[in-house]
């Protein structure tokens, strides 16, 4: 009798897990992901995430929703306007801190995966200007105090905020730059290269992949250099903004003569903390198991690994994501 009871219990447990797995595999999800403008990398990532979810759960789909970008996506996901959202690490850091442009901390977002962390801040300076003032890195810029015309991106853009924090790491403000006889120009990234080429600025800072066509284009018009951050400054900026310390490799551009230390923007896939643990688990699982669907959307995504997906530290991972990452040994 005892043996029969144990056998029956064993069969029940096995049957339970088989049934649970079958239910999970047969689950169909209809989700929305909010990204940025159509045609950009984030729309491609949205398509890759859709493909991964379809592969893991046939009959499912993820609809891509355009938006104003990561700052807007914080509000959309936190208010339940979409199940999934893509947000830059620096935007997410500002959100959880309640720093500009947010009026108060956003506390109900959770991470599913780090999607990339290789969009480095590249401080590009006209080489003729650099030679005139003996500038090779940001420390030189601060020491020499030249009348530099610095394009920092538009107001409200987080790249502009990172440029501000880079200067701040050396004890310098925008007002200090102006006191040197310089200017701070709020020029969009698509304008910066043209402005450098036609002599309207001496320097710009942008967070884009390396190499990037806008920087290559500018370097064909005027000779340029890239300014390096010190170890201490890069760590200060990383701690303040949520960006990651990063090295731009010498081979990224023909005119670079060494590796350049900086910080990099990244993008994270986030959800509302009200999402069920099982849904978050299933999404995380299928993204890792079908990672090639995301790697294949653009050549810049080929470096994506499961280890990287589990490596962000700006906000907490969703409990469902944690459960999966622990199961496969990606986090302890």
Predicted segments, located by residue:
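Extracytoplasmic "Venus flytrap"
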Residues: 29-49, 69, 155-159
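Short beta-strand->loop
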Residues: 34-39, 125-127, 144-159, 186-187, ...
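A conserved helix-loop-strand patch within extracytoplasmic ligand-binding domains
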Residues: 108-156
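An extracytoplasmic/periplasmic, membrane-proximal ligand-sensing/linker region
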Residues: 170, 198, 203, 208-220, ...
